[in-house]
């Protein structure tokens, strides 16, 4: 099985507000994460990864596939209260 790689476009790093690149990588590399289809604000289709940082902070990371085993990190944000509720339900159902 091939290793999955992640890359950051420069513009995506510039758009991180209140979230460190390290926190994003924690979510992407944790064993428990919830992949879901999503859309960016401009309508771009992406894969979203819902997960927690090592400190337990719930984040959503947006990815766009660049190559078969390579993904670009194009977005990251904190979950809304409603999303946290949905994510916690998923966590309980998928222990």
Give short role names for the model-derived ranges.
Residues 1-95:
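Ribonuclease/tRNase effector modules and their secretory precursors
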